[in-house]
Amino acid sequence: MNKNYYAILMAGGVGSRFWPVSTTEFPKQFHDMLGSGDTLIQKTFSRLSKLIPVENILILTNEKYNNLVLEQLPMVKQEQVLLEPAMRNTAPCILYASLKIKKQNPDALMVVAPSDHWIEDENLFTENLKQCFDFCSKEDSLMTLGIKPTFPNTGFGYIEYNKSDNNPIKTVSQFREKPDYETAKSFLASGNFLWNGGIFIWSVKSIVAAFEKFQPQMTGLFLKGFENYNTNSEAAFINDNYANAENVSIDYAILEKAKNVYVLPATFDWNDLGTWGSLHEKLDKDENNNAVVNATVLLNNSSSNIISTSKDKLVIIDGLEDFIVVDKDNVLLIYPKSKEQEIKGIVASLKK
């Protein structure tokens, strides 16, 4: 394996649209959402380790999930787990991890990947990632893997690339925020828009240079502790300084400003597993389009539902269509799939 290959696995999210299974104490990346025997973070780590040395995969997560990471990924050492003492979006944590890697290996090439996505053909993913690494090793570039849209989704940001670019790797024209439905339809009709899946590839030299140019204040904050990285004093420096970083995404902080941004349209099948509905799409279904995770079910006159319970639960349903049925601990959720985006708000209101 190439010792210059590194990965940053983003594992700090809560996944509140998957409540009541995904909670602040035990978020979705640490669950076996697909009923496959592996949690989402385990599947993602395994996928990345086909190309990247295990010791070069860093896990970025919240302090409260440290034990969960070490339990589910026993091959990972504590120094590979980067703990955020405060939630500051994606730019600060990516800069922190990039500087830590740069100190260890100035020639490093790295991928930033979410820990909770579903990818069908892992060999194609590996091929695409290798193609991006090869490009970034030769060019001063910031790359992303774009996902070919299959319908006008209003829940994703979009990447517009140069229509006249006939190369496999395209020049990015601009990043577009989550659109309304009509705008999303126009994006698909244009033919040069991709979903932003949040998978980024670059050399540490290129990303650190971009931070120095576009985020000098944030870069100064984290460079102040450069001598502490990969030493026993790293945690103390991060605890004392991390919360002072601006709360900003990598898209807004860097990618929307830089001119050397490229995209490779991915050839693998992808799903962000962001909602119960998206999980329903990827699970095996019966002849009436019902998907079941763990439960034993008896279904009559019911279709297009997703049912998730513990393995010892018997669920009997009659006359239900397009619903989410989730039984977890002391919560039973029965909710229309068409209103699944409301679940996040329900969780917030329950906390008040």
What role is predicted for each listed range?
Residues 1-9, 17-24, 35-114, 118-124, ...:
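Conserved N-terminal catalytic core of the sugar/cofactor nucleotidyltransferase
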Residues 2-4, 204-352:
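Left-handed beta-helix
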Residues 9-11, 60, 111-114, 144-148, ...:
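Short beta-strand segments
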Residues 29-35:
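Glycine-rich phosphate-binding "P-loop"
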Residues 41, 97, 116, 159, ...:
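Residue-level signal for inorganic ion chemistry
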Residues 59, 83, 112, 143-145, ...:
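General beta-strand structural signal in soluble alpha/beta enzymes
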Residues 122-239, 262, 312, 336-337:
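Conserved core of the sugar-phosphate nucleotidyltransferase
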